[in-house]
């Protein structure tokens, strides 16, 4: 007996076509190569399992997430074999967090016909208000809007990026700002390890534009993943609260 013919939504067909173009471009052109004197990223935390006390944010589903501005709605990014692909609209966690350890694995597309902020752009917003940039910045002299930067604030100390189409890791230790009344008396601080290399080492940060509305500095906040129009993927995202 013949199996019934499956049909797919226009969005699914469009998504498949875009991925096909990325794959063809990668085969025909190939990503750039790393300079010999550049530091070497590692895979030592790729696939790292969540420790005791951690909450899985992206596994097989996006049940922990909702669209921005629609807390009761379901996040609609497609998830295939544990990897979520950016679709229409940024998403945020339903829960909020103060001090934490966050593990994120991401994969940026190969877009050789694009430049700058159009090359695999997304962002991980800590507490919904501090953006850790995601971008194809492989082999570049980094600026404060490149991959691994706290957007428009901190330039990574080293370029730890892998080529596009390879899975990469962020391991983030974050301590929230401290308040006395409504006044911030201690800014938020964080350390970021990208692909096994420390790129930000215990630096103070302030809120960046474009995050979750109505989240205030010093209070608990969600994790937000940004839709910037590129097919960035995320997987194995988990978070573990830390003591103040």
Predicted regions located by residue number:
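N-terminal secretory signal peptides that target proteins for export/translocation
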Residues: 1-14
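Serine/threonine-rich, low-complexity intrinsically disordered segments
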Residues: 7-9, 29, 35
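Bacterial N-terminal signal peptides
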Residues: 18-30
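Carbohydrate-interacting regions of secretory-pathway proteins
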Residues: 32-244
């Amino acid at each position: 007996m013949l199996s019934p013919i499956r049909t797919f939504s226009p969005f699914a067909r469009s998504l498949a076509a875009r991925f096909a173009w990325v794959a063809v471009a990668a085969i025909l052109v190939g990503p750039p190569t790393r300079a010999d004197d550049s530091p070497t990223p590692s895979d030592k935390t790729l696939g790292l399992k969540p420790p005791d006390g951690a909450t899985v944010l992206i596994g097989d589903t996006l049940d922990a997430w909702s669209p921005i501005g629609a807390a009761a709605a379901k996040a609609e990014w497609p998830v295939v074999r544990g990897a979520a692909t950016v679709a229409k609209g940024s998403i945020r966690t339903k829960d909020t967090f103060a001090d934490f350890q966050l593990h994120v694995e991401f994969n940026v597309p190969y877009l050789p016909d694009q430049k700058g902020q159009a090359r695999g752009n997304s962002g991980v917003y800590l507490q919904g208000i501090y953006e850790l940039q995601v971008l194809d910045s492989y082999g570049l002299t980094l600026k404060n809007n490149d991959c691994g930067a706290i957007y428009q604030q901190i330039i990574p100390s080293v370029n730890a990026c892998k080529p596009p189409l390879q899975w990469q890791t962020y391991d983030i230790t974050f301590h929230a700002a401290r308040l006395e009344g409504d006044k911030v008396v201690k800014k938020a601080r964080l350390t970021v390890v990208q692909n096994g290399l420390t790129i930000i080492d215990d630096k103070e940060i302030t809120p960046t534009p474009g995050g979750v509305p109505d989240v205030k500095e010093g209070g608990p906040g969600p994790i937000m993943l940004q839709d910037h129009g590129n097919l960035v993927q995320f997987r194995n995202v988990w978070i573990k609260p830390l003591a103040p």
